[in-house]
Amino acid sequence: MKGKIFLHNVLLLLLVFGFVESWGYSQEQKQEEKKEEQKEPEAVDIEDAAKEGNKAPDVGYTKEEYDEFQKALNKPDLKLRAEGLSQFIKTHPSSKLNEHAMNAFPTIMKQLYEQKDMATLGSVAEGFLQMKPDDVLALGSAMEAFHSTRDYAKAVKYGEAYYVKQPSAQVAQLLAHSYGELKNDAKFASYAEKCIPEMNAKDAFPYSAKLSYYYADRKDIPRAAQHCQKMMAAYGEGETPPGYTSERWVQEKARAYSIIGRNYYERKQFGNAVGAYNNSLKYYRQNDEAYYYLGMCFWQANDSVTALKSFAKAYSLNKPYSKTARSSMETLYKQLHNGSLEGIDAILRTATAEMK
């Protein structure tokens, strides 16, 4: 009996606590909903809202900047305009007007080129390249402007950078000429080789002539001969290249044919070598090298008589090839006379008489 009463009391307590908890939760929820209903919107400052509405959009520059930019852009003098725009960019490095300032330079450079104001063009192009180092138009403008004003050091500085971006025979020719003026033979040769194949023989002549000396000095006979042949092809008999006197041109032809002959000889084309050396002697009879190699060619052709005469003439001139010519002459003569030199003096006397 007591157990039933105890169980009844426990159940009653659970019901009471459950009701209280449920009622408490319900009351809290109602209070929260009431707070939400009573919450008022935040007040709006009408004056601040009006200011915000009238605020100008951010264009990336001030009115003062714009006026300064327009003043520079509208300068009638192209040099002053470029200087003004450059100064604006330096003064306002973050201004959105800088893009417009930069875009004005190509027009300025083109107008200076059309006006043939190369001194100003060089200055403007060089200044622009400080701001935009890889600009193709500015590189080309600087190259041509400084070449025109004979500032060859700057011409090659900007010209080589331009050639990397826009290679052409015309640019190579300008660089070759500039390096020639700067006495930089290696660079001259490099760019001359690039432009000559695209030029006609007469236009290429000055470059071919200089290259013939360049390679001959370095004992590169094949290349020297190649350019000598181009020289000889440029002007016919009776013609004289610009800048040459007739006497100098005669000497040049003698030298060129001698180099051509030497190249044929080293390639064992002895018949062609004889023709080239005879051409050289036509313009310069005192060419000891020509007589010596003619002797060697005739020896190879088993024409011993003509070979001995040629060696004798080379010896009689008393020039650098004389000693070698005498040695070759004696060797050949001994082969023909059982090791004896008896009678060789007669050949030498005849050769000496013919050379007078």
Model-derived features: where do they sit?
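Residue-level recognition of tetratricopeptide repeat
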Residues: 107-110, 144, 177, 209-213, ...
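Helix-start (N-cap) detector for alpha-helical repeat units in TPR-like alpha-solenoids
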Residues: 65, 99-102, 136-137, 169-170, ...
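Terminal, low-structured helical/coil segments at or just beyond the last alpha-helical repeat
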Residues: 242, 247-254, 266, 313-356
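TPR/TPR-like (Sel1-like) alpha-helical repeat modules
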Residues: 164, 226-236, 299-323, 330-334, ...
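Structural motif corresponding to the intra-repeat A-B loop/turn of tetratricopeptide repeats
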Residues: 112-115, 149, 182, 218, ...
